[in-house]
């Protein structure tokens, strides 16, 4: 097998050949050193987000054929300092740890450091001098994140100290100064603690409601507004009145909501609570005593229960029971922010844990399953059960193409699809069985029959077979599976017991248009009424059949089971035999018509990505090795020299590009394409690929791929921005309150109607018959 190694910046990509699934990571590093020239200790290898460590194999990391492994070159410092600089970056800072170290928590070099008494650094609480507000004054304080004003109380007042250590003097005692710091505490949010604000974000608490006739256009007032849900009660913002309108029944007022000093605003917002508009108090007005104020009404914190204390709510209270009692016994998950009573957990906790972070059972990650950077992989239970894990054989089984695994999967039709695969004509050739699996024609890598014992058989492969199998091309006898000891990791063995009509043998028998009979077999009265079976012939069948391909695997079309019966084979054991007969409209690939059609369609051998390059690289290595051996050995005679023009002639003699037969659309299909007006531009581009033959279907699949599920759209919704998405995918997006096009983020709106594009659905069903099954 071979893989691609790419540098982390993406500038250099090299292919590494002659690898195995059992290749050690340290051996891979040695190969990378030869090709990239990077020292072993400077290499960091990553595959699918995991850092590859020595001692493991490519199989342990599930590295597949032609997969990409990323190479990060580690920078090794010339000299390691003996002592870290003060406030320097430690080794833990460059690692992948998730927690904060004790040294970081106690460091005084970071931002927001505090003194011993808890007072922020650079703040002097002595000799503050005159200020606008005093301790215990009731004020409105602005939240710097959202720009809304909340009721608060001043806890203390302090003075900022200049960097030179001298206190800033207040020149005008009546004017506000940036050097005065107000320590305030929000009344409704004590959990936020004490917040430091300047005079711009603190003012006297609003207490005067303005009547309707006193509201003037251009006046700045305090209003209640909810930016997310304008029809609901929200928080208190400064706003400039834009216009007002009064009729006999309603009063309307539109404002520009001001969101802080940065200049951000929300224009043309309608205020619903016109009777609760407050005047902004000027500095120097009469102070409010602690006994007097009437609290303003804010929007509910919880949209589900509207802050009703008698109503159980799993959103704002305990996520298990919904109860709002015992708030001191509730734990808040640091991941999902849901609350849990300690006695509602399973198992319950006796006390609040002392850990800094706590995660609920749904969010908690098992520390034993987490693989940190630099750690070895955990043992896989699945791989531990494999025969290769307990085998004592030293044979390198990881070089075969049957072990590389699929690099892609056929999703155009489900795995239990009967009949042809759309876009795969009769006569298609593949070099390896794994490619046949990727195309969807025959999904198992090794097994000869693909099916289900309660449904039927979908495909089979004619490979080595049995000695007494008869292949007449359009009709052949096939011997069932089983009766062999394939324990361990064996692929084949001699017949050692009788076969039974179970598992895949029964699946193939179900394709016969006759009642199942596991004693004597059955014969179909109308063999064409049976279920279709896709048949692939392998080159290994050449020892028994002249119809097998010269190389690789070939798709030979649809066959039907005529009859099946038990009999004793040459081995002396009972085997089940099946007679299959061809029933396909496309000509057989060995016939004259079939050969002409293969030529017209331009069907040639298909190789895995990178296979030909790997093969050419091996040939060059052999040639170089041979030349080195010849140059080192003493010459006894003249060696024939290659002509100077031979290499050029080989390069010029490229095969002629054969003309491919165009893909033909039926009259009904052309009519449906014309009816699909919404996708007229896409169809014009797709129709230009008709002359490419089978590639036309690949272009259709690529063009009408749903961006959500990455499959051909089913029940397509063609949006107003001309993107095609499955109705189910778009419906799930709308249920998640995301009303944008998944492709371009165009706003579709909450009331967007999901109308299926019926002409597009009809043409896709004709081009890809059966693709809607399982969707």
Curated annotation (Swiss-Prot):
<dbReference type="InterPro" id="IPR013083">
    <property type="entry name" value="Znf_RING/FYVE/PHD"/>
</dbReference>
<feature type="binding site">
    <location>
        <begin position="463"/>
        <end position="464"/>
    </location>
    <ligand>
        <name>DNA</name>
    </ligand>
</feature>
<keyword id="KW-0805">Transcription regulation</keyword>
<dbReference type="GO" id="GO:0062072">
    <property type="term" value="F:histone H3K9me2/3 reader activity"/>
</dbReference>
<feature type="site" description="Required for affinity and specificity for 5-mCpG sequence">
    <location>
        <position position="491"/>
    </location>
</feature>
<keyword id="KW-0156">Chromatin regulator</keyword>
<dbReference type="InterPro" id="IPR001965">
    <property type="entry name" value="Znf_PHD"/>
</dbReference>
<dbReference type="InterPro" id="IPR021991">
    <property type="entry name" value="TTD_dom"/>
</dbReference>
<dbReference type="GO" id="GO:0005657">
    <property type="term" value="C:replication fork"/>
</dbReference>
<dbReference type="GO" id="GO:0005634">
    <property type="term" value="C:nucleus"/>
</dbReference>
<keyword id="KW-0863">Zinc-finger</keyword>
<keyword id="KW-0678">Repressor</keyword>
<dbReference type="GO" id="GO:0000122">
    <property type="term" value="P:negative regulation of transcription by RNA polymerase II"/>
</dbReference>
<feature type="domain" description="YDG">
    <location>
        <begin position="419"/>
        <end position="582"/>
    </location>
</feature>
<dbReference type="GO" id="GO:0000791">
    <property type="term" value="C:euchromatin"/>
</dbReference>
<feature type="region of interest" description="Histone H3R2me0 binding">
    <location>
        <begin position="333"/>
        <end position="337"/>
    </location>
</feature>
<keyword id="KW-0539">Nucleus</keyword>
<comment type="function">
    <text>Multidomain protein that acts as a key epigenetic regulator by bridging DNA methylation and chromatin modification. Specifically recognizes and binds hemimethylated DNA at replication forks via its YDG domain and recruits dnmt1 methyltransferase to ensure faithful propagation of the DNA methylation patterns through DNA replication.</text>
</comment>
<feature type="region of interest" description="Disordered">
    <location>
        <begin position="616"/>
        <end position="655"/>
    </location>
</feature>
<feature type="zinc finger region" description="PHD-type">
    <location>
        <begin position="299"/>
        <end position="366"/>
    </location>
</feature>
<keyword id="KW-0833">Ubl conjugation pathway</keyword>
<dbReference type="GO" id="GO:0006511">
    <property type="term" value="P:ubiquitin-dependent protein catabolic process"/>
</dbReference>
<feature type="binding site">
    <location>
        <position position="469"/>
    </location>
    <ligand>
        <name>DNA</name>
    </ligand>
</feature>
<protein>
    <recommendedName>
        <fullName>E3 ubiquitin-protein ligase UHRF1</fullName>
        <ecNumber>2.3.2.27</ecNumber>
    </recommendedName>
</protein>
<dbReference type="GO" id="GO:0031507">
    <property type="term" value="P:heterochromatin formation"/>
</dbReference>
<feature type="site" description="Required to confer preferential recognition of cytosine over thymine">
    <location>
        <position position="479"/>
    </location>
</feature>
<dbReference type="Pfam" id="PF00628">
    <property type="entry name" value="PHD"/>
</dbReference>
<keyword id="KW-0808">Transferase</keyword>
<dbReference type="Pfam" id="PF12148">
    <property type="entry name" value="TTD"/>
</dbReference>
<feature type="region of interest" description="Disordered">
    <location>
        <begin position="81"/>
        <end position="128"/>
    </location>
</feature>
<dbReference type="Pfam" id="PF00240">
    <property type="entry name" value="ubiquitin"/>
</dbReference>
<dbReference type="GO" id="GO:0044027">
    <property type="term" value="P:negative regulation of gene expression via chromosomal CpG island methylation"/>
</dbReference>
<keyword id="KW-0804">Transcription</keyword>
<dbReference type="InterPro" id="IPR045134">
    <property type="entry name" value="UHRF1/2-like"/>
</dbReference>
<keyword id="KW-0131">Cell cycle</keyword>
<dbReference type="GO" id="GO:0042393">
    <property type="term" value="F:histone binding"/>
</dbReference>
<dbReference type="InterPro" id="IPR003105">
    <property type="entry name" value="SRA_YDG"/>
</dbReference>
<dbReference type="GO" id="GO:0008270">
    <property type="term" value="F:zinc ion binding"/>
</dbReference>
<dbReference type="InterPro" id="IPR001841">
    <property type="entry name" value="Znf_RING"/>
</dbReference>
<dbReference type="GO" id="GO:0016567">
    <property type="term" value="P:protein ubiquitination"/>
</dbReference>
<dbReference type="InterPro" id="IPR017907">
    <property type="entry name" value="Znf_RING_CS"/>
</dbReference>
<dbReference type="GO" id="GO:0000785">
    <property type="term" value="C:chromatin"/>
</dbReference>
């Amino acid at each position: 097998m071979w893989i691609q190694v790419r540098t982390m910046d993406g500038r250099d990509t090299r292919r590494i050949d002659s690898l195995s699934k059992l290749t050690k990571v340290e051996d891979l590093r040695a190969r990378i050193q030869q090709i990239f020239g990077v020292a072993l200790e400077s290499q960091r290898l990553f595959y699918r987000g995991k850092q590859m460590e020595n001692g493991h194999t490519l199989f342990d990391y599930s590295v597949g054929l032609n997969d990409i492994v990323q190479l990060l070159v580690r920078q090794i410092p010339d000299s390691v300092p003996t002592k870290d600089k003060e406030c320097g970056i430690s080794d833990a800072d460059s690692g992948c740890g998730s927690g904060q170290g004790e040294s970081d928590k106690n460091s005084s070099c970071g931002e927001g450091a505090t003194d011993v008494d808890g007072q922020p650094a650079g703040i002097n609480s002595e000799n503050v001098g005159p200020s606008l507000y005093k301790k215990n004054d009731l004020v409105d304080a602005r939240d710097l994140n959202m720009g809304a004003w909340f009721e608060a109380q001043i806890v203390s007042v302090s003075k900022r100290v200049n960097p030179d250590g001298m206190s800033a003097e207040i020149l005008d005692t009546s004017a506000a100064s940036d050097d005065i710091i107000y320590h305030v505490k929000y009344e409704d949010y004590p959990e936020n603690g004490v917040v430091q604000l300047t005079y711009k974000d603190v003012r006297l608490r609003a207490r005067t409601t303005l009547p309707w006739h006193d509201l003037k256009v251009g006046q700045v007032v305090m209003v209640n507004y909810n930016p997310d849900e304008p029809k609901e009660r929200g928080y208190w913002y400064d706003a400039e009145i834009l216009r007002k309108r009064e009729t006999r029944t309603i009063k309307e007022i539109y404002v520009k909501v001001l969101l802080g000093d940065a200049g951000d605003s929300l224009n043309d917002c309608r205020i619903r609570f016109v009777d609760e508009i407050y005047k902004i108090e000027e500095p120097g007005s009469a102070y409010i005593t602690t006994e007097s104020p009437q609290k303003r009404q804010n929007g509910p914190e919880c949209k589900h229960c509207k802050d009703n204390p008698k109503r159980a709510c799993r959103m704002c209270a305990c996520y298990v029971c919904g109860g709002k009692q015992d708030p001191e016994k509730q734990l808040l998950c640091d991941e999902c922010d849901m609350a849990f009573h300690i006695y509602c957990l399973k198992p319950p906790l006796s006390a609040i844990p002392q850990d800094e972070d706590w995660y609920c059972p749904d969010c908690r990650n098992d520390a034993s399953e987490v693989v940190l950077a630099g750690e070895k992989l955990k043992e896989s239970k699945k791989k531990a059960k494999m025969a290769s894990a307990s085998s004592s054989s030293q044979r390198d089984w990881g070089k075969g193409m049957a072990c590389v695994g699929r690099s892609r999967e056929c999703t155009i039709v489900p795995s239990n699809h009967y009949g042809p695969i759309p876009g795969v004509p009769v006569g298609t050739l593949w070099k390896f069985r794994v490619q046949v699996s990727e195309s969807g024609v025959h999904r198992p890598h090794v097994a000869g029959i693909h099916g289900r014992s309660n449904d039927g058989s979908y495909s089979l492969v004619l490979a080595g077979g049995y000695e007494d199998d008869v292949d007449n091309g359009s009709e052949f006898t096939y011997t069932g599976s089983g009766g062999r000891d394939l324990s361990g990791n064996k692929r084949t063995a001699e017949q050692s017991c009788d076969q039974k009509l179970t598992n895949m043998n029964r699946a193939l028998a179900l394709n016969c248009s006759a009642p199942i009979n596991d004693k004597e077999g059955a014969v179909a009265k109308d063999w064409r009424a049976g279920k279709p079976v896709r048949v692939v012939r392998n080159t290994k069948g050449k020892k028994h059949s002249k119809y097998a391909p010269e190389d690789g695997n070939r798709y030979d079309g649809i066959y039907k089971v005529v009859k099946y019966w038990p009999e004793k084979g040459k081995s002396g054991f009972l085997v089940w035999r099946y007679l299959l007969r061809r029933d396909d409209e496309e000509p057989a690939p060995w016939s004259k018509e079939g050969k002409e059609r293969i030529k017209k369609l331009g069907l040639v051998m298909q190789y895995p990505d990178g296979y030909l390059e790997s093969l050419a690289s091996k040939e060059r290595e052999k040639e170089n090795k041979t030349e080195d051996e010849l140059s080192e050995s003493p010459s006894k005679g003249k060696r024939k020299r290659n002509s100077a023009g031979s290499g050029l002639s080989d390069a010029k003699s490229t095969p002629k590009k054969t003309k491919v037969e165009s893909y033909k659309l039926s009259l009904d299909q052309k009519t449906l394409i014309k009816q699909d007006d919404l996708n007229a531009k896409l169809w014009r581009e797709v129709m230009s690929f008709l002359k490419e033959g089978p590639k036309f279907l690949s272009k259709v699949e690529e063009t009408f791929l749903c961006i959500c599920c990455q499959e051909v759209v089913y029940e397509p919704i063609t949006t107003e921005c001309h993107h095609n998405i499955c109705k189910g995918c778009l419906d799930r997006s709308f249920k998640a309150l995301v009303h944008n096009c998944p492709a371009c983020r165009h706003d579709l709106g909450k009331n967007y109607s999901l109308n299926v594009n019926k002409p597009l659905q009809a043409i896709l069903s004709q081009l890809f018959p059966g693709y809607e099954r399982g969707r």
